[in-house]
Amino acid sequence: MRGGNRLGAGRKVIPESEKKKRKSVYITDKLYTRIMDTDIENCNNFSQKCMALIELAMENLNKNNQEHSVKRNNILMVRDTKSTYNKTNNNFEKQNRGIKLTFIDLFAGIGGIRLGFEDKYTKCVFSSEWDKYAAQTYEANYGEKPHGDITKINENDIPDQDVLLAGFPCQPFSNIGKREGFAHERRNIIFDVLRILKKKQPKMFLLENVKGLLTNDNGNTFRVILDNLKSLGYSVFYEVMDAQNFGLPQRRERIVIVGFHPDLGINDFSFPKGNPDNKVPINAILEHNPTGYSISKRLQESYLFKKDDGKPQIVDFRCTYQVNTLVASYHKIQRLTGTFVKDGETGLRLFSELELKRLMGFPVDFKVPVSRTQMYRQFGNSVAVPMIKAVAGAMKERLLLAEMQVLKK
């Protein structure tokens, strides 16, 4: 029997209070971008994301006003990392209201890549850094002391992981150095990454290095690295990215390489483009007359303005452009021209600790328990955190899509 008085026949009646109605709200372009960039479960458009965020905010308010806990199935989860693939049973592994994506942090430095990748739905299970001063800064901020030289660590002693992160040393490929590539004494380090990938078979990896890696030895160095990564079965993608497109007032081009395990069936990946039309100028991050960073008149006269290989870049509070790349040897004024601030007791100074953090996208409360020399070296060797964070978000989103397709099979 169709229609009529049959129970449940006809169109479902939706209570007036539950009907969706068009409402107008005014928001900034910046807020719109933040909403659209937020990964929310089962939400694909702006309207759905707004509703989800509002519901979440209301639930959090209610939760804060009540002492009892809210049941798990009534909680809307907004998260960056949506899923992780269980190698043994092709299932989703859920812990602590979210997904725990395990990762290892190789050539960790002071933890810039970790800072960009880590969130409350990820867990670092292993880190390695050979430099004792960088390890000191790493431990001060993450509460764990990295293991030492990765070349001396057996891959069997490294925990299994979902993601391998590595900012392998860039000196052999840097435009500033001699561009020795595989002729450099650290040439074998990339092969340590390869042996760990081969043994542990993580779902994905993220590698970062200087742009010069692409052209070193007429491109042969990069081709060898790429061929070796692909020989392990991984789908490999790379892109030259610039920190100035990701909210930092610094021109800092780096090559980022990501790879996905063959079991995921991923054949495409789009790197985030950032916001090249809305760059942050250097004067936005300068602080007024910080003490202890002035360059003496003697050094200014002896080195800065008498070098044959160019003059330094001088900035002040009127400058609305992006500065040159911060390098590890920035503090060695007598060796390199660099960027200096027209400010301070002697009229010229180095970047302050706070400015270094802002240049690289580190939080202002990031601890720096080392000498001034080591501080400049460590930040100069680190990564543009917002850029890594954007790549990490794209990787997690692509992994989710692939895992959902696997689960449907």
From Swiss-Prot:
> Which catalysed reactions does the entry list for this protein?
a 2'-deoxycytidine in DNA + S-adenosyl-L-methionine = a 5-methyl-2'-deoxycytidine in DNA + S-adenosyl-L-homocysteine + H(+)
Give the Gene Ontology MF terms in alphabetical order. Answer: DNA (cytosine-5-)-methyltransferase activity; DNA binding
Catalytic residues? 170
In short, the EC number is 2.1.1.37
Alphabetized UniProt keyword annotations: DNA-binding, Methyltransferase, Restriction system, S-adenosyl-L-methionine, Transferase
PROSITE patterns according to UniProt: C5_MTASE_1 (PS00094), C5_MTASE_2 (PS00095), SAM_MT_C5 (PS51679)
Q: Name one GO biological process term.
A: methylation
InterPro entries for this protein: C5-MTase, C5_DNA_meth_AS, C5_MeTfrase, C5_meth_CS, SAM-dependent_MTases_sf
Instruction: Indicate the transmembrane segments per the record.
Output: none
Q: Does the keyword Nuclease apply?
A: no
Q: Where is the SAM-dependent MTase C5-type domain?
A: 101-402
From what superkingdom does this record's organism come? Bacteria
Q: Which family does it belong to?
A: Belongs to the class I-like SAM-binding methyltransferase superfamily. C5-methyltransferase family.
**NCBIfam families according to UniProt:** dcm
Q: What is this protein called?
A: Type II methyltransferase M.BsuFI
Which organism encodes this protein? Bacillus subtilis
